[in-house]
Amino acid sequence: MGEKSFKKGFLWGGATAANQIEGAYNEGGRGLANTDFLKYVAPNERRADEATFEQTYASLQEAKAHEDTYIFPKRWGNDFYHHYKEDIALMAEMGFSVFRMSISWSRIFPTGFEEKPNEEGLAFYDKVFDECHKYGIEPLVTMLHYDFPLPVCEKLNGFESRETITLFEKYVRTIVERYHKKVKYWLTFNEINMSLQSLSTCSGAMRDHSLKGLDEEQLTFEVVHNMLLASAKAVILVHEIAPEALAGNMVWKHVYYPKTVRPEDTLQQIFDMNLNYYFYDIQCKGVVPYYLDRYFEQKNIKRNYSPEDIETLKKGKADFLSFSYYMSNISEYQGEPMKFTGLLPDQSRNNPYLKMTDWGWSIDPVGLRIALNQLYTRYGLPIFIAEFGIGMYESMDSNHQIHDQGRIEFVEAHLKQIKEAIKDGVDVFGV
């Protein structure tokens, strides 16, 4: 038997999000999104955790009140809306065979509440997909990547409300019916588990705007459950409308190491990993796992799934799984009740065996191999690595060039570990 490696047809590409690249926030019939009110933060004020981009109702209203004063970078992105042809040509020049991108919900339904979609927005993505296929590039489309129609956030507090599930279903049906002949691979939500740490970014729900007066813990998991239900409904719609297409999930994969060989640290590691697996188990197995029951009881968190919801979760299982991977973390037991370690740099900075990025995130290529083996062993589904990369402080030389050797070495090291995972027997079909 020959040595396993990247198989023929392996998908090589890159990833973007509509709110990061499109710009044209007030063109083509697009409505305002929550991300259009995220203010510019100077480099010396930025933090490597979610506090930099978490939006509250108070901060949103303050930004709206001073709209003429602040800079809102996501309104302009890199102007992909007007330069998608040049951008996709550059992707082809680099050898891309896949382009992970997202559709802006507010470009299709400007407020989220319209009965009929915005044809100009639909036509824009037709042109983008056609341009991709012109170069033999397969679009891999994220349905919702952190940008919501603003009224959905203000009136419904995002996925706190079940009405948002209904609006999302309408949006999903519209885009899948429109593009099912042009898009083979779909992802429902980007990094759905980040709702545990950056609720508004992931779900459109602001912690200080609960319409039901829920405390933060209850609000978070009510939102999580509504998003998981919406994800299942989206998968079901893809299967009904486009049985030839594949619908996947996308989670920020956490890799945790016990801080010591103390048994309690391993117990904490299991708890931390279970909070990550919770999202995979529901989306890949269609079951609501037992292992958070004690945590919910300790926190007095109620799970409001009906029998119909449980059936929907069973029916809406993903065809493949995907994830982002940026660093590994350390689990250290702090007593009962256990607390989620999270993804903040404080937890990744403590590993003496790893180097750190300029942002204090651990550089751990072997952790990617570990992640791939963990997920394939547990679920047996094909895997697409939706994101990995590194943030660096960079500067141009006198010839206006950036010498990217550090990033080249970073990517090379991670690709080698992907190859090792494939040798291990993991079915990885793209990155």
Outline where the language-model segments fall:
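Active-site mouth loops of central-metabolism enzymes
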Residues: 69-83, 160-163
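A short acidic, glycine/proline-enriched capping/turn motif at secondary-structure boundaries
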Residues: 97, 106-108, 146-148
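Glycine-rich, proline-tolerant flexible connector loops at the mouths of alpha/beta enzymes
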Residues: 103-117
